[in-house]
């Protein structure tokens, strides 16, 4: 589904790739949309587990955790297999108007992802920029927007460097917010 998109991937292709009969597919899933919801949830759960192991969580200073989170995403784009995209972002772009149940699952995953960053931002703000007027909630969603946009642009340009550059700009922006 990540390679071709939800709409272009047929149940027959899913069954062939999984080595299942159509009968087996429909025994376990109500239909393709049910599978789509479960795939989105599984994709996010897998990413969340990977993310939970990131070293920045060990940092005592919340500002270092904030910057470390961005650095973690930058490093992920340098790996031997840079991200080819985000299934959640792909699903939302393709299905937001036609499959509200899948869109809702993706929105919940994005919100959950932003919550951890928001908490670190709130702690960093209280410690390092108590008079700042920016919203930790809005800024945490801004990271999602930048990351999703960078993934799309990296695909369009076929160059993961775009991800590093976009996140590097965001990191610089964050540092400037804490210097005000």
Segments predicted by a language model, with ranges:
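Helix-turn-helix
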Residues: 2-34, 38
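Alpha-helical structural segments
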Residues: 3, 17, 34-57, 64-79, ...
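Short coil/turn segments at alpha/beta junctions that flank glycine-rich nucleotide-binding fingerprints
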Residues: 3-7, 58, 84, 127
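Amphipathic alpha-helical segments used for helix-helix packing
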Residues: 65, 80-101
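Short, well-structured alpha-helical segments
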Residues: 67, 136-144
């Amino acid at each position: 589904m990540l390679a071709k998109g939800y709409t272009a991937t047929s149940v027959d292709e899913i069954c062939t790739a999984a080595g299942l009969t159509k009968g087996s597919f429909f025994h376990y899933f109500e239909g393709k949309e049910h599978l789509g919801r479960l795939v989105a949830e599984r994709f996010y759960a897998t990413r969340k587990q990977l993310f939970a192991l990131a070293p920045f969580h060990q940092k005592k200073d919340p500002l270092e955790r904030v910057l470390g989170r961005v650095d973690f995403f930058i490093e992920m784009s340098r790996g031997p297999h840079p991200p080819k995209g985000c299934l959640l972002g792909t699903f939302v772009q393709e299905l937001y108007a036609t499959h509200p149940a899948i869109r809702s699952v993706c929105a919940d995953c994005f919100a959950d992802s932003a919550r951890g960053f928001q908490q670190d931002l709130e702690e960093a703000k209280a410690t390092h920029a108590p008079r700042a007027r920016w919203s930790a909630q809005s800024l945490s969603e801004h990271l999602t927007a930048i990351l999703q946009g960078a993934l799309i642009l990296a695909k369009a340009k076929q160059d993961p460097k775009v991800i590093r550059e976009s996140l590097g700009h965001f990191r610089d922006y964050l540092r400037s917010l804490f210097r005000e």
